[in-house]
Design a protein with these regions (language model features):
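Structural and coupling elements of P-loop NTPases
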Residues: 1-689
Length: 689
């Protein structure tokens, strides 16, 4: 593929709800561009872009993939993103590399939650937005109903460009409203045909265009209000400018699996979609933390953002990047601004799906890949040593679904950790680590399906079988009553014996773990043994009397005892303290504490009742409600951590994916008696007490 100037490069992310046909649209584009001899089908597992074994097995996109094509002297970098909410991290990666988002909408299902989320994310990332209504050959598809929903959901900026003429249930004629020409698809080919009689509907669509164009400037708005007609040049210029500045959201349509409407879509993109150069510049910070502007200029100092990483044990590591300024080749010196180290570029590639081709260089505005950058991760900035700058990285959603992960074969814990570390290089929404208290390896992701894919990849890529279990809860124990007890340790076994004798007062306090004090008089216990008594208690409180959980909020005061001048030792008094603890705790009204977390659930207004009811069902307390962003409501509550395990699944289901939440530990409080009893019984059955 030849080199293109940034003015002739389009970086377009395909986004939208799962099942809308994003990958099919991309495959149709690849086919029409002459880069494939057939249109890949997801059901057959033979697409260019869904090449990952997990995608082939599940018949759904789970990673972001890139495919450059050439169309009418323009290079289009197609960035196909996942639609499932569990893989939102991939959508953010794809949009970071894009300059516009083509949001694919099902002609049958219409505007889904994934449509809304894609629009919001594109807005947040400053991308131009366009719509493609797909699947119109399905008899259940209803383009005009979907168009009206787009308009009512996203406002008057929604503007029709290509619309179908449906006759006898067939959607194989498409009208370009700008050209005022009709095209028919027959036997795999597109040809111009007579304009169909669409009656008042066509006039209504042209009015929709005028309304959208009128919003692009005050002059055109005045003209529209006065009832004057726009010239064809004004319409084309207004739409082109409006699309690029975001004041117009163009709508295309067709059926990707049959290539219907895809030619017209590609033709329109070459003049409607913003080029890499249209963006003008990106902002970053220099080494002093001061903001700097980096122009999209091939003659500038090199600067690129790494937006995706593939870490495959068989193929090796591959870092996908977008060049903002300059050129990147094997001769380009590059600094990784996160590590401060220079990276050695052995090869520069262009990638189409899993196919790699050597490139002499990748210029400003374009996308490429570099193999074997071992210390580079997604979000890193690579730049010339002569102009050090850090570009905006990628903000990932916080994982909300957590499980404990165990190897099926004992002793393979390190193998699991190594595999997860590699997978986390590819997918930063994976978080994992060892819970030192419960002695479990914990993994967090975006949902059940996300973790299911991780388990499958561990087996297929890193040859380690694992099982997921509900994570253990880190309970605590405390006391509610003041007691005084003796701890006496005496042992005689020939020679020097062991002797330690202490009287300790145990009482509740506000401390985090143990507060140790002494008020011994008359040398009943020598001062030199005080540290041993404290050490014995600190070791002992790691296991409470009820269920073996650590004890907190305990004050222990050593106030009396006795010693033997020969047999007493630090170990003797350490043992005596442990005996006092063991004797005293059951008498001090021990209580089980459970961790409580602070919940903030962002949900649509009509789901507030569902969420509040669910909080109550999970033994939580609703603290209040506040208006949030984008018309959402924020429900604030406190909920026991033990009740939150599957809350991410619940909130996604009840809000159809619109809701989100944050949850973090706040404090411990008494567990209800019935709950405490179950926990204590389980601990006894597991041998923890």
């Amino acid at each position: 593929m030849k080199q293109y100037d940034a003015k002739k490069i389009l970086n377009i992310a395909l986004a939208g709800h799962s099942g809308a046909g994003k990958t099919s649209v991309a495959e149709s584009m690849i086919y029409l561009a002459g880069l494939s001899d057939r249109i890949g089908k997801i059901a057959d597992g033979n697409t260019v872009l869904d090449y990952d074994p997990e995608e082939i097995k599940r018949k759904v996109s789970v990673i972001t993939a890139v495919a450059p094509i050439e169309w009418k002297n323009t290079k289009i970098n197609i960035i196909d993103t996942p639609g499932l909410f569990d893989f939102e991290g991939g959508v953010r990666e794809g949009m970071r590399a894009a300059d516009s988002a083509l949001i694919v909408v099902s002609g049958k299902n219409g505007v889904d939650v994934g449509t809304e989320k894609a629009v919001k994310l594109a807005d947040k990332m400053g991308l131009t937005k366009m719509f493609f209504v797909n699947g119109l050959c399905d008899e259940s598809a209803r383009f005009y109903r979907v168009f009206e929903t787009l308009k009512s959901t996203f406002g008057p900026a929604v503007c029709p460009v290509i619309v179908p003429y449906i006759q006898d249930g067939k959607a194989n004629v498409y009208v370009n409203l700008f050209e005022y020409k009709a095209y028919k698809y027959e036997n795999g080919k597109m040809s111009q045909t007579d304009m169909p009689d669409m009656g008042d509907r066509l006039e209504g669509l042209r009015v929709a265009i005028k309304e959208a164009v009128a919003e692009t400037s005050e002059e055109l708005l005045d003209k529209f209000i006065m009832g004057e007609e726009f010239t064809p040049e004004e319409i084309i210029l207004g739409v082109s400018q409006g699309v690029k500045d975001g004041s117009i959201l163009p709508v295309f349509c067709g059926d990707a699996q049959n290539t219907f409407g895809i030619n017209q879509l590609l033709d329109s993109l070459t003049w409607l979609a913003p080029s890499a150069a249209d963006k003008g510049s990106e902002f970053g910070v220099d080494t002093n933390g001061d903001p700097v502007e980096i122009s999209v200029n091939e003659n500038g100092a090199a600067a690129a953002i790494v937006f995706k990483t593939v870490a495959d044990p068989f193929v090796g590591k591959l870092s996908y990047f977008k060049v903002i300024s300059g050129k990147i080749s094997t001769d380009t010196p590059l600094i990784n601004m996160r590590t401060g180290n220079q990276e050695r570029i052995t090869k520069v590639l262009t990638v189409r799906g899993k196919k790699q081709e050597d490139a002499s260089y990748v210029g400003a505005g374009d996308i490429g890949a570099i193999p074997k950058l071992q210390n580079t991760i997604t979000g890193d900035t690579l730049c010339a040593p002569t102009r050090k700058v850090v570009l905006d990285g990628i903000t990932y959603p916080n994982p909300t679904y957590t499980m404990a992960i165990y190897p099926k074969t004992k002793g393979e814990e390190e193998k699991v950790a190594a595999g997860l570390a590699k997978l986390a290089e590819e997918d930063p929404t994976i978080k994992f680590g060892m819970n030192t208290e419960t002695h479990e390896m914990i993994i967090s992701g975006m949902g059940e399906q996300h973790l299911d894919v991780i388990v499958s990849k561990l087996k297929n890529k890193y040859n380690v079988d694992v099982v997921l279990k509900e994570p253990k809860i880190a309970y605590r124990e405390t006391i509610r009553k003041k007691v005084s007890v003796q701890g006496r340790h005496k042992k005689q076994s020939g020679g020097h014996g062991q002797f330690g004798d202490v009287w300790i007062e145990f009482e509740p306090c506000d401390c985090d773990d143990l507060e140790f004090a002494e008020r011994v008089v008359g040398g009943a216990v020598p001062k030199g043994f005080f540290p041993a008594v404290e050490k014995g208690l600190r070791d002992a409180i790691q296991k409470g009397p009820l269920a073996g959980y650590p004890v907190v909020g305990l004050k222990a005061t050593l106030y009396d005892g006795s010693y033997h001048p020969v047999d007493s030792s630090e170990m003797s008094f350490k043992m005596a303290a442990a005996i006092a603890y063991k004797n005293g705790m059951p008498q001090a009204n021990p209580t089980l504490l459970e961790p409580i977390g602070s919940l903030k659930a962002m949900v649509p207004d009509n789901n507030m009742g569902d969420i509040m009811g669910e909080v109550t069902k999970r033994r939580g307390r609703v603290l209040g409600m506040n208006p949030g962003e984008d018309g959402m409501q924020v429900v604030e509550a406190e909920v026991p951590m033990a009740e939150m395990h599957d809350f991410s699944t619940y909130i996604r289901q009840v809000t159809q994916g619109r809701g989100s939440f944050t949850f973090e530990f706040t404090r411990y409080e008494d567990a209800p008696a019935n709950i405490a009893q179950k926990i204590i019984e389980n601990a006894k059955n597991e041998g923890n007490v």
